[in-house]
């Protein structure tokens, strides 16, 4: 597992003029959050409005996953900007996508999966280079079998759907396509307000075990997508090609951060 100090040390190396990008992933550990004292202490690190949204979730799993996502958002923005998490000020776009209001050098995107929450963030050199990014983490458990594919026909383009029908492993291809589409909607910030069938990634029938990268132009913007397995889920990031060119990679480093590391971070920074 990556420790807080190692993450801070790694990020500190990019301070200055060189852009940087990274993916942070945290497992949703309900056994740790089942302790009432721990759950309530972590909740108190969040604004009251965020606490209310979490408590309004019906299931304990959803409350835990949303809490982990909020903590990861604070953690990631804090260690990359060097600001104490209590100094961070967030706002939301017209469709609810969060952004860091007091530091416009740091576009980021959040996603919640079945077992993990994830964050993709980019450290820009200047505000002139600020561009949105997107991330999604998709689970094969959302695939209901070939007999249910017809129910999702309107979600895919004709080429995508035909490729899916011909795939030898339709479960993986379904998960891959879903993560591609969702990462793009996280990039645009439009979410469910997007007609997913209009986002056409073509006929895909294979997803390599080592992951895959794709360069495609959508809505006149050249974009880089990179997808990879993380345990049993597929993580996909979306970023403008201009950002990929500046950071000189289409595969940012992924940091697997334990929930206990996150908790230690807030303790060390007087949040608990």
Curated annotation (Swiss-Prot):
It catalyses: apo-[ACP] + CoA = holo-[ACP] + adenosine 3',5'-bisphosphate + H(+). It comes from Saccharomyces cerevisiae (strain ATCC 204508 / S288c). One of its GO terms (molecular function) is magnesium ion binding. The gene is LYS5. This is L-aminoadipate-semialdehyde dehydrogenase-phosphopantetheinyl transferase. Belongs to the P-Pant transferase superfamily. AcpS family. The keyword Protease does not apply. It comes from the Eukaryota. Keywords: Transferase. Catalyzes the transfer of a 4'-phosphopantetheine moiety from coenzyme A to a serine residue of acceptor proteins, such as alpha-aminoadipate reductase. Necessary for alpha-aminoadipate reductase activity. GO terms for cellular component: cytoplasm; cytosol. GO terms for biological process: lysine biosynthetic process via aminoadipic acid. Present with 623 molecules/cell in log phase SD medium. The keyword Transferase applies. Its EC number is 2.7.8.7. InterPro entries: 4-PPantetheinyl_Trfase_dom (IPR008278), 4-PPantetheinyl_Trfase_dom_sf (IPR037143), P-Pant_transferase_sf (IPR050559).
